[in-house]
Amino acid sequence: TDHAGFELKEFIKSHLNVLNYEVEDCGALEMDPLDDYPDFIIPAARKVASNPNSKGIIMGGSGQGEAIAANRIKGARAVVYYDGPMEIVKLSRMHNNANILSFGSRFITHEKAAEAVDLWLNEPFEGGRHKQRIDKLDN
């Protein structure tokens, strides 16, 4: 995240640590109102794309630019979630095998983001016809 999502990132990081998840923080490591999200999102997306068993959580003011940046990396499949039906979070994993979840910190509460993270991290990918579609994206 950049400065816009810094507080939410710290909250989610703490939430995941309590649940004993291994968390690698790609930044920002301190609040800097002049930082730029690509400096943090691109390295995070590269890490996720290089390890098929990893997942990433990114955020910014809207989450949109962050998802666009992440999706520039081959193998990264970032989706944006706002405070909407949780079924969207489930489907992003079940059908799209999303490996990066992006939040707009200006549009979601910390608690709702944590709820979405918990669901998203535990939702399996269905594979089958959905895998065939995703494979076409990476060719």
PLM regions and their residue ranges:
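Glycine-rich phosphate/diphosphate-binding loop of Rossmann-like nucleotide-binding domains
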Residues: 1-22
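C-terminal binding/interaction regions
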Residues: 1-7, 86-139
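Short amphipathic alpha-helical segments
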Residues: 10-13, 68-72, 114
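A short beta-strand-loop structural module common to alpha/beta enzyme folds
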Residues: 22-34
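Short, conserved beta-strand edge motifs with alternating hydrophobic and charged residues
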Residues: 24-27, 56-60
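Short, structured active-site "lid" loops
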Residues: 39-58
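Mid-chain, well-packed structural core segment of small domains
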Residues: 59-106
